[in-house]
């Protein structure tokens, strides 16, 4: 009976949305068109399942992110980013791993659902895929705590759950999906210099490589967030001194180290935008809390990518050059 009610609700929604286009083919439009199509999908599925659209969007964005960098997953080719392995979609004992028949999929305990009422449960149909994911989450509840439980049971990884929750927090706060803008981490008018130092050798505390770019500037020059994100970490590290970590919607962790101090009232969990002041350039680090002055003042800026299994450093220098150039061109 509950499946019948869901099916009827979907049919009614399609009748009320005569211009809706939930096709799974690649969009030929610009980014604004893609964002609009995704938002339409998320809002429609929210109406059917009562799962908040920003959680659906966050899961979709997270999976799109990891599919873009993982070699063991196919690259996303449609509006949605969620991916189900054939065995999970069709059922582990289903002899037809490309099955799109809802009845046989259900018979073999597959998760695939016919979301748009075309008689097929297709892994390449955006609405089918997103509704399947949303229905899974709905089985745990639609409030924050139960959705977190559902996410953990699906991904079995605390870090993944926290990233998805942070992305959902950003989407909910801003009410939109286009949160890709960036800015340079120090004021353009400041005296600053930097070169590509990612991968250079470092000796203090043992042999290691430099996982970032050093931007030299005067002591106390404001340090700003480079992205839309959530403050994930704030505190002391014997290498980085006073430092801040911010996570954006692309699973990228932005690391700001050797600060002279933090912006007033900056706290973990806070939402920031490009240009939000988070601290000042300093020379803290290389010792116990409060150690400072062992090197010239500079900002150590690092970027780390999470792929669903682990997190690794990548070169931020090209991004810094791009953001600096973009900001200068806007002046």
Which ranges hold each PLM region?
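Active-site loop architecture of trypsin-fold serine endopeptidases
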Residues: 205, 281-298
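Catalytic glycan-binding domains that act on GlcNAc-containing polysaccharides
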Residues: 25-175
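Surface-exposed, glycine-biased beta-strand/turn segments
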Residues: 166-242, 274, 331
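Short, acidic/hydrophobic/Gly-rich beta-strand patch recurrent on exposed beta strands
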Residues: 213-215, 243-249, 302
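Sec-dependent N-terminal signal peptides of Gram-positive bacterial secreted proteins and lipoproteins
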Residues: 2-25
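Zn2+-dependent peptidoglycan hydrolase active-site motif and core
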Residues: 226-268, 289-296
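Acidic, glycine-rich catalytic/binding loops that coordinate metals and/or anionic ligands
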Residues: 182, 294-331
């Amino acid at each position: 009976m509950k499946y019948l009610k869901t099916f009827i609700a979907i049919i009614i929604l399609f009748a009320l949305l005569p211009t809706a286009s939930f096709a799974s083919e690649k969009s030929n439009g610009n980014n604004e068109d893609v964002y609009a199509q995704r938002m339409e999908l998320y809002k429609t599925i929210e109406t059917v399942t009562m799962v908040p659209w920003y959680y659906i969007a966050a899961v979709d964005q997270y999976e799109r992110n990891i599919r873009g960098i993982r070699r063991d997953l196919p690259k996303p080719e449609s509006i949605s980013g969620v991916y189900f392995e054939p065995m999970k979609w069709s059922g582990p004992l289903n002899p037809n791993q490309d099955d799109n028949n809802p009845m046989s999929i259900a018979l073999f305990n597959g998760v695939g659902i016919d979301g748009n009422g075309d008689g097929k449960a297709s892994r390449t149909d955006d609405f089918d895929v997103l509704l399947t994911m949303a229905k899974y989450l709905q089985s745990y509840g639609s409030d924050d705590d139960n959705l977190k439980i559902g996410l953990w049971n699906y991904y079995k990884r605390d870090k993944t759950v926290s990233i998805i929750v942070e992305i959902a927090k950003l989407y909910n706060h801003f009410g939109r999906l286009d949160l890709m803008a960036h800015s340079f981490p120090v004021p353009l008018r400041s005296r600053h210099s930097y070169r590509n130092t990612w991968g250079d050798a470092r000796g203090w505390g043992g042999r290691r490589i430099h996982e970032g770019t050093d931007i030299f500037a005067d002591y106390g020059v404001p340090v700003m967030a480079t992205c839309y994100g959530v403050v994930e970490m704030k505190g002391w590290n014997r290498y980085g001194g006073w430092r801040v970590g911010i996570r954006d919607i692309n699973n990228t962790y932005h690391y700001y180290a050797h600060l002279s101090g933090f912006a007033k009232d900056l706290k973990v969990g806070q939402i920031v935008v490009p240009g939000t002041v988070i601290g000042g350039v300093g020379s803290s680090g290389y010792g116990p809390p409060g150690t400072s002055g062992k090197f010239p003042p500079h900002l150590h800026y690092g970027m780390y990518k999470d792929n669903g299994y682990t997190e690794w450093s990548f070169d931020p220098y090209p991004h810094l050059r791009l953001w600096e150039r973009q900001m200068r061109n806007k002046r």
